[in-house]
């Protein structure tokens, strides 16, 4: 776990500079339209206005293998394909943030997106969604802070094994230390960079 350096650069939209800015850019719009139609995406309700579950990679190769298999019984084929798809389900990240811009940024960096508005159901979804492998949450949100969400997750015997990453635009050492001591996997300072997302997702998938 690292304690990040001071925040520098960026336009305040949550994207590190260099052509990826969400203000009027085309890159983010592509992801918002769900350019990768074959990707599976589960939309959930969050602690503020939205929480989104984003698959980190597809299971196209597993589905291709299913297509190559032949069986005389068509019904059995369908059942087998469904079972294989369930077994090949990709890991998911739940992004929780009261800022629609920051949610979209995280989604774009994770390269899979389909989402809509929702309410306060993050913990409920965590209890019923077995494929959630990591949670990325903003620290400062109305109604429930990311720190409070972290505490509830770590207090749950069923959820405490899920890595939680906290994000914040404020570099407050005491806040960072408190989150890490409470069990946060990492603490990211906004604007979140692609390298940050790559680092934490690579570590999670090992």
UniProtKB/Swiss-Prot annotation:
Protein name: Two-component response regulator ORR7
Species of the source: Oryza sativa subsp. indica (Rice)
Domain Response regulatory: 92-205
Entry keywords, A to Z: Cytokinin signaling pathway, Phosphoprotein, Transcription, Transcription regulation, Two-component regulatory system
Family: Belongs to the ARR family. Type-A subfamily.
GO biological process, any: response to cytokinin
InterPro entries, per database record: ARR-like (IPR045279), CheY-like_superfamily (IPR011006), Sig_transdc_resp-reg_receiver (IPR001789)
Renumbered residue ranges of the record's region Disordered: 53-92
4-aspartylphosphate modification, residue list: 138
Keyword Transcription regulation: yes
Keyword set includes Lipid biosynthesis: no
Induction comment: By cytokinin.
Post-translational modification note: Two-component system major event consists of a His-to-Asp phosphorelay between a sensor histidine kinase (HK) and a response regulator (RR). In plants, the His-to-Asp phosphorelay involves an additional intermediate named Histidine-containing phosphotransfer protein (HPt). This multistep phosphorelay consists of a His-Asp-His-Asp sequential transfer of a phosphate group between first a His and an Asp of the HK protein, followed by the transfer to a conserved His of the HPt protein and finally the transfer to an Asp in the receiver domain of the RR protein.
Pfam families found in the cross-reference section: Response_reg
SUPFAM superfamilies according to UniProt: CheY-like
Function: Functions as a response regulator involved in His-to-Asp phosphorelay signal transduction system. Phosphorylation of the Asp residue in the receiver domain activates the ability of the protein to promote the transcription of target genes. Type-A response regulators seem to act as negative regulators of the cytokinin signaling.
Start-end of Acidic residues biased regions: 61-88
Tissue expression notes: Expressed in flowers, and at low levels in roots, mature leaves and shoots.
Cited PROSITE patterns: RESPONSE_REGULATORY (PS50110)
